Swiss-Prot record:
Root EC class: oxidoreductase
Protein name according to UniProt: Catalase-peroxidase
Function: Bifunctional enzyme with both catalase and broad-spectrum peroxidase activity.
Pfam families assigned to the protein according to its UniProt record, in alphabetical order: peroxidase
Originating organism: Francisella tularensis subsp. novicida (strain U112)
MF annotations from Gene Ontology: catalase activity; heme binding; metal ion binding
Length: 739
């Protein structure tokens, strides 16, 4: 039934993918070396932002009175508006759904989605069928946003709305952090196939690949009626587990979130099935201009209140839909549930043995009562063995249920914010959680300029090569993802499982480097009597800087790469192995690495994706690739793309030789994805290269940048630009010094 309702609600926001789709930047699915898309490297949000160039959210936030904002939010909850009346006289459940669906797009596979940048305001998310009528929720918040202006972001306000609502209805949160910054346009996340692709494809069902975090088209998580709209309880359990694990949630957290969330509010399917198609207008991105960004206009009855049309399911779960309790679990276990249909024709369940105390008040008519409902997905929490364990536990221990929901809600709404150092505001909980990728606070004095000079000399004297130092530092820092601010050099997790065992990090070689750096660290720390210490994380980065500086010196250039100490070393206990494995890259074009799962023709686009994750622009990506090739730091000492007669020296040889027309490039007949550079006159092999290397001479935009670095007179510029880009990568994740 949901498919019919979704069609009526408008397919403009619906997204679908076959089970073979790749959850990555949407451009990777059709990219070839000839058609590499550089748009992920263009920071259009800054260009499109209406804010002043010097606007800083952290500074603007200092003008905010959080307590007054919270009071205004609390007052709003019970100020029902005629144009969209509040169910039960309280917008709290509506705002909980708003926050949940905003944060619930997060996916752990690539860090995309989530609440951090307020993407729910833009297409396609604002028009997803699962987000039906949330445009009204955001509109209800507008007077508050208008009042406080740029002192609070939309993305913070949307999440705060749900959190304040919980507290107002008796569920005390464990805290809330401000610090989310707004985007100004829809991003390029691949959520699945577009409606046009759906109609033209031979996709046989609406199931999404696991990496998409949802399981069916246009939904945040799963179809509440059951898989593909069929009331299959066991199948629903499987899809729930898939969807929530894709967000990084455990079974316990999943049960807490669903059972806790369905303690509040109601679902809407009041329009008769035969009236849905004609009554419901298009989603916001296809709505008539006079509707001013509001979609899903409902011409049935009053169009709101008791005539509201949402998911198509109709009813409430408990008799107290605006108060926290564990009645959802009580009803789940003590009522006998029978399959039925909502007025809109959606599969749902009602009890055959409901007592007067179980009856649910009508959301708008005083004195009218209804039977409670359950979704197919709700019943899965009882019938599935893994979920049943926790529903029973929570049913028998209401206080534990309350505590676990509070923790799961905080995780849901803060997971994509990155480390705790990005949090601002007065309500940050003191407790640290492993999903925050915590690093310990430094309980020692940081190294001085003199100490840094001594450590650099110790590194030079250690016997480690420039290549060893550079690659180790790169492998450590380049785990960063700008999407959810995870990874980076802070924590030195390259010395811990799982990173130390990743293929791309060449574990045997890595172990040698880390052992020597740890020796330097121990000797230095033992020699200091004033409380000064250096972390392994700082030494890894400093070692990389030393390697680059020495390589530049060998080429005749004197540079000093900035070094900002303050990184600390995480412990294995602070590191979630399963979660960190999602940071493992399939390919890293900066070191010509691939695990074999990415086809050769997709490697250039994968490089762009990697550069985007590192928050690089086109020139930065270009100069880093050229420099890394000259430095001879490819994975497994591969010579592909090392287009220089002075390997290990930091110079612009890569670009000079790539653009030299005395070389003719041909595909290798021995190795897929390898190209042979042959002298036009001699006919002899000069070089080998990968598609990643050759894209800088093939793609017109990249070639234009490459030519700048190959020009006579720009040799020093190349070295300087490489050093700046290198430093930028080494500083990724250092939010402790970037606010």
């Amino acid at each position: 039934m949901l498919k019919k309702i979704v069609t009526a609600l408008g397919m403009s926001g619906m997204l679908l993918a076959s089970n073979s789709a790749i959850a990555d930047d949407k451009n990777t699915e059709t990219a070839t070396p000839q058609s590499v898309d550089l748009s992920p490297l263009r920071n259009l949000n800054k260009l499109d932002s209406p804010m002043d160039k010097d606007y800083n959210y952290h500074q603007a936030f200092k003008k905010l009175d959080p307590e007054q904002l919270k009071k205004d939010m609390q007052d709003l909850l019970t100020q029902s508006q005629d144009w969209w009346p509040a169910d039960f006289g309280n917008y709290g459940p509506f705002f909980i759904r708003l926050s949940w669906h905003d944060a619930g797009t997060y996916r752990i596979y690539d860090g995309r989605g989530g609440a951090n940048r307020g993407q729910q305001r833009f297409s396609p998310l604002n028009s997803w069928p699962d987000n039906v009528n949330l445009d009204k929720a955001r509109q209800l918040l507008w007077p508050i946003k208008q009042k406080y202006g740029d002192a609070v972001s939309w993305s913070d306000l949307i999440v705060l709305a749900g959190t304040v609502s919980l507290e107002s209805m008796g569920m005390k949160p464990i805290g809330f952090a401000f610090g989310r910054e707004d985007d100004w346009q829809g991003d390029d996340t691949n959520w699945g196939l577009s409606p046009e692709e759906i109609m033209s494809s031979n996709v046989r069902d609406g199931k999404l690949a696991p990496a998409y975090a949802a399981t069916q088209m246009g939904l945040i998580y799963v179809n509440p009626e059951g898989p593909d709209g069929k009331p299959d309880i066991k199948g629903a359990a499987s899809e729930i587990r898939q969807a929530f694990r894709a967000m990084g949630m455990t079974d316990k957290e999943t049960v807490a979130l669903i059972a806790g969330g369905h303690t509040f509010g109601k679902t809407h399917g009041a329009v008769p099935e035969d009236k849905v198609k004609e009554a419901i207008g298009p989603a916001p991105d296809k709505a008539p201009i006079e509707q001013q960004g509001l979609g899903w206009h409902n011409s049935y009855g009053t169009g709101n209140g008791d005539d509201t049309m949402g998911s198509g399911l109709e009813g409430s779960w408990t008799s107290t839909p605006t108060f926290w309790n564990h009645d959802f679990l009580h009803n789940l276990y003590n009522l006998n549930w029978k399959k039925t249909l909502s007025p809109a024709g959606a599969h749902q369940w009602t009890p055959t043995n409901a007592k007067p105390e179980n009856m649910v008040p009508d959301a708008h008519k005083l004195g009218v009562k209804h039977k409670p409902i359950m979704f197919t997905t709700d019943l899965a929490l009882k019938e599935d063995d893994g979920f049943n364990k926790y529903t029973q536990e929570f049913y028998n221990n209401p206080e534990e249920f309350k505590e676990e929901f509070a923790k799961a809600w905080f995780k849901l709404t803060h997971r994509d914010m990155g480390p705790k150092s990005r949090y601002i505001g007065p309500w940050i909980p003191e407790q640290n959680f492993i999903w925050q990728d915590p690093v310990p606070a430094a309980d020692y004095k940081q190294v001085s300029t003199q100490d840094i000079a001594q450590l650099k000399q110790d590194i030079i004297d250690s016997g480690l090569t420039n290549q060893q130092l550079i690659k180790t530092a790169w492998d450590s820092a380049s785990t960063y993802r700008k999407t959810d601010y995870r990874g980076g050099s802070n924590g030195a997790r390259i010395a811990l499982a799982p990173e130390k065992d990743w293929q791309m990090n060449e574990p045997a070689k890595l172990e040698v480097v880390l052992a020597k750096l740890k020796e330097i660290q121990t000797n230095f720390n033992n020699s200091k009597t004033d409380g000064t210490k250096v972390s392994l994380a700082d030494l890894i980065v400093l070692g990389g800087n030393v390697g680059v500086e020495q390589a530049a010196k060998q080429a005749g250039y004197n540079i000093q790469i900035p070094f900002v100490p303050g990184r600390t070393d995480a412990t294995q206990a602070q590191t979630d192995i399963e979660s960190f494995n999602y940071l493992k890259t399939k390919s890293d074009g900066f070191i010509n690495y691939t695990d074999g799962s990415v086809s050769a023709d997709k490697l250039p686009q994968a490089l762009v994706e990697k550069a985007s994750m590192l928050d690089l622009n086109i020139p930065e990506m270009t100069v880093l690739v050229g420099g890394m090739r000259a430095l001879n730091v490819n994975y497994d000492n591969s010579q592909e793309g090392v287009l220089t007669t002075t390997p290990g020296q930091l110079n612009n040889s890569f670009f000079v030789n790539l653009l030299d027309m005395s070389t003719q490039w041909k595909k290798s007949d021995k190795k897929d994805g390898e190209y042979i550079g042959i002298g036009r006159k001699t006919g002899k092999q000069k070089w080998t290269a990968s598609p990643v290397d050759l894209i800088f001479g093939s793609n017109s935009e990249l070639k234009a940048v490459a030519q700048v670095y190959a020009e006579n007179g720009n040799e020093q510029k190349f070295v300087n630009d490489f050093a700046k880009a290198w430093h930028k990568v080494m500083m990724l994740g250092r939010f402790d010094v970037q606010q």
